[in-house]
């Protein structure tokens, strides 16, 4: 639809006039190309049908070389359109414009505003989409019946494949197969295909190829993503010379570089992170991400560990001297199946209870609680046997209370057995004494031991039979291996009595049971279970657990999920009657703090989170393991700091948006005011034109009267005297 401008203009066809001509006859409002020319001859004097013209550059107004047009006919001419009334105002999407392109003014429409006074323009003549600056554009005017009209703004239809949209086209490349090349949509052809223009990836190449493709060979451009790391066997698209080629990451190299297998031939090439993106598929109008490569290809890169059956050979020998009965030498031989485990037996020899040399095992019996145990039954009866993990270092005794051991899963399996001895025992009685140990009431270390039978194919396990035991490891890293025993009566004694009287409540020697000696070799298949690190069953506390609340606390889900073994040593400074109550309060406090952490909200103040962290610090002094909750609190505080910064930036951006919006509204008001003034000025101009025309007519009459008077005057002077 055409909109009138109220301006009329006649075509001047005299020599030297600047006009615009078309290369073909045009229809009003249709797309065409108009060239700026200078007439080289007058239309009235020329007896030829065609007129000679001189082609001008559409912007610079000098001769265009080489000229694209030299002659024209009258019906292809029109005056030069009126100048742009608002050259400082940017065009909007859908505006019909003329673009200075290839020596002429090509009509088209704006399909996208790029910013910084840059626009994507769809050209109707020789269909194309090009990027142009504001200075290379002008409003599209139509000259009809000696009057200028403007075209109404077009309504653009937005879609994934509308003109000017960035897309990717599937092309075939030798050795690489399918490659997705970047392109831009121009228009939809009548046969249902899409006319697109391939984008070049080389800066030196300017001309872009136009091709028609079907909808199955085209897809929108994926959204850009930030820099990220890629994993082994991950599906990616790699940027090659002709586009994005699908591939699989085969190697992760140093310096954020990757080796990628491309195409059906699996050609391997190296790429940086900037040249890769996750591989995604356009299907049914939705992006689908390809899954990681699995199967035989991935299994070659994975490492899988399987448990092997273990055969343990144990040799137990008694001490020869009564005064050194605290140590018992044990020879341990560990063998494994063909899974690649060690087959080295530990050399062991023992003399008179002395600590063995490197590779030997010695065991000490103490009256302190134990932390981790595993037991053996059968010919050994109820005698204790602890399985420890060591890397070719000896297991040595440790007096008094031993420090908890660290759990190391990748070490050699060894066995240590704890036996209370007193006096000497002949070798003939060793095995019998071992069998009769079940009925001994004086032996405080009578433990239930069982060896589970397992079905074929099941993993081997160690059965944990008694919680009041502790295993430590001593090797090159000074880790001690200690097996200790505690009487039931000593567990309930306060820590103060231990400090004054020592580890034994009776003040007697540690060794209180009859001497039990063994000098035999027992071979058993034992199932192995790795005891979780940090497992503790009994702790020497500064008070006696008398309240029934302890069972309730220990049965709570929170202490099953996050096991705790606090020592409550700071309570020694409190009154003895208040210690148990204070300890229960701290257990409840730990549970409530974990619940508070779980119930934290994103809008909670940082001060309240810091107070929770300070409470955990106080509980840590009492032996609570607060590493996990404090780590979570640290992450939450970090997120809160980021949230605070983001909120401040958001506030600043919103203020800037409000400020710019106010400016935009002011500009709109100014534009409306200018348009109103334009209408008023046009009306005033029309009034002045009419007034000028009236006055010109009056002036003509007066001029004629003046001429008549002059003629009369001359006639009177020229009249004869006769």
From Swiss-Prot:
Positions in coiled-coil regions: 645-712
Domain DUF724: 540-720
InterPro entries, A to Z: Agenet-like_dom, Agenet_dom_plant, DUF724
One protein family per Pfam: DUF724
Alphabetical UniProt keywords: Coiled coil, Flowering, Growth regulation, Nucleus, Transport
Tissue: Expressed in roots, leaves, stems and flowers.
Main location as per UniProt: nucleus
Record has Transmembrane as a keyword: no
GO biological process, one term: flower development
Keyword Nucleus set for record: yes
The organism's place on the tree of life at top rank: Eukaryota
One GO cellular component term: nucleus
UniProt biased composition (Polar residues): 434-444
Disordered: annotated span: 424-449
Molecular function via GO: protein homodimerization activity
CDD domains: Tudor_Agenet_AtDUF_rpt2_4
Cell compartments where the protein resides: Nucleus
The protein's role, per its UniProt record: May act as a link between DNA replication, transcription and chromatin remodeling during flower development. May participate in the repression of LHP1-targeted genes during flower development by direct interaction with LHP1. May be involved in the polar growth of plant cells via transportation of RNAs.
Miscellaneous field: Plants with reduced expression of DUF7 show a slight delay in flowering.
Subunit: Homodimer. Interacts wtih ABAP1, ARIA and LHP1. Interacts with the non-modified histones H1, H2B, H3 and H4.
Protein name in UniProt: DUF724 domain-containing protein 7
Organism annotation: Arabidopsis thaliana (Mouse-ear cress)
